[in-house]
Amino acid sequence: MFPKLGMGELVVILLIVVILFGASKLPQLGAGLGQGIRSFKKSFSGEDEEKPSTPGATSSDEASKAKQA
């Protein structure tokens, strides 16, 4: 579907990106791209970042149980 990119083509693409965004923005672009890929992979694997340790238990429930004990 896509033509194979050789080293020359990749260098030209990199030069265009540097000209458009500037060298100072490249680390920010790379970090944003990495975070996007990571979140995309997590969404496919079904992982959630915020999983409670016990289903249905909240911090207020745990606090009230600790006061009763």
Curated annotation (Swiss-Prot):
Stretches for region Disordered: 43-69
InterPro entries recorded: TatA/B/E, TatA/E
Bilayer-spanning residue ranges: 1-21
Topology with respect to the bilayer: Single-pass membrane protein
UniProt keyword annotations, A-Z: Cell inner membrane, Cell membrane, Membrane, Protein transport, Translocation, Transmembrane, Transmembrane helix, Transport
GO annotation, cellular component aspect: TAT protein transport complex
Superkingdom of source: Bacteria
Gene Ontology molecular function, alphabetical: protein transmembrane transporter activity
Localisation: Cell inner membrane
GO terms, biological process: protein transport by the Tat complex
Subunit-level organization: The Tat system comprises two distinct complexes: a TatABC complex, containing multiple copies of TatA, TatB and TatC subunits, and a separate TatA complex, containing only TatA subunits. Substrates initially bind to the TatABC complex, which probably triggers association of the separate TatA complex to form the active translocon.
Entry function: Part of the twin-arginine translocation (Tat) system that transports large folded proteins containing a characteristic twin-arginine motif in their signal peptide across membranes. TatA could form the protein-conducting channel of the Tat system.
NCBIfam families (UniProt xref): tatAE (TIGR01411)
PANTHER family (UniProt xref): SEC-INDEPENDENT PROTEIN TRANSLOCASE PROTEIN TATA (PTHR42982:SF1)
Family label: Belongs to the TatA/E family.
Protein name: Sec-independent protein translocase protein TatA
Organism: Anaeromyxobacter sp. (strain Fw109-5)
Lineage: Bacteria, Pseudomonadati, Myxococcota, Myxococcia, Myxococcales
